[in-house]
């Protein structure tokens, strides 16, 4: 890479660190090209991105961002996975790490919070924003459904009473 290309790459990576909801850093030594391509396609399908950058350039790109606290993670062969949705990158990376023992999660960041490997693992177990929205809508709809059931119940009970009286009169 020439100096101008490096400057452009650092600027681009700096924007990524500023705009991402979450960033995960992991070692990938020993991962084959096919496995890496599979990982990248899974991340892309979920709405995230995977980049491999020189550690020195990544550290420079971190300067002036909220994620600056994770500069110590960039040692060895590292990859950077990021997404706008804070739950996507940790989930996809942890799923890939389960099937491929050569991927070792080092940590990451979520906004201004620097995460260690355990925090990334626990973040991956949380439901996504869409799942949380669905649960919230379900909770909001439940009382309305119950109210409709309660309002309809007296009318149906009254109808059963009239039906019972009608059958009683017919039998007599």
Curated annotation (Swiss-Prot):
It comes from the Bacteria. This is Large ribosomal subunit protein uL10. PROSITE patterns: RIBOSOMAL_L10 (PS01109). GO terms for cellular component: large ribosomal subunit. Part of the ribosomal stalk of the 50S ribosomal subunit. The N-terminus interacts with L11 and the large rRNA to form the base of the stalk. The C-terminus forms an elongated spine to which 3 L12 dimers bind in a sequential fashion forming a heptameric L10(L12)2(L12)2(L12)2 complex. One of its GO terms (molecular function) is large ribosomal subunit rRNA binding. Gene3D superfamilies: 3.30.70.1730, 6.10.250.290. Forms part of the ribosomal stalk, playing a central role in the interaction of the ribosome with GTP-bound translation factors. HAMAP family: Ribosomal_uL10 (MF_00362). One of its GO terms (biological process) is translation. The keyword Lipid metabolism does not apply. The keyword Transmembrane does not apply. CDD domains: Ribosomal_L10 (cd05797). Keywords: Ribonucleoprotein, Ribosomal protein, RNA-binding, rRNA-binding.
């Amino acid at each position: 890479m020439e100096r101008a290309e490096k400057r452009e790459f650092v600027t681009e990576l700096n924007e990524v660190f500023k705009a991402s909801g979450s960033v995960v850093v992991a070692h990938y030594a020993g991962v084959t090209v096919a496995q890496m391509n599979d990982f990248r396609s899974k991340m892309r399908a979920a709405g995230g991105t995977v980049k491999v950058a020189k550690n020195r350039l990544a550290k420079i790109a971190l300067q002036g961002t909220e994620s600056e606290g994770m500069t110590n993670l960039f040692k060895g062969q590292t990859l950077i996975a990021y997404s706008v949705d804070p739950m996507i990158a940790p989930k996809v990376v942890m799923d890939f790490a389960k099937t491929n023992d050569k991927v070792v999660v080092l940590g990451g960041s979520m906004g201004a919070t620097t995460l260690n490997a355990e925090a990334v693992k626990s973040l991956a177990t949380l439901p996504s924003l869409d799942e949380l929205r669905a649960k919230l809508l379900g909770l909001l709809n439940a009382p309305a459904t119950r109210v409709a059931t309660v309002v309809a119940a007296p009318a149906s009970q009254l109808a059963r009473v009239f039906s019972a009286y009608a059958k009683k009169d017919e039998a007599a």
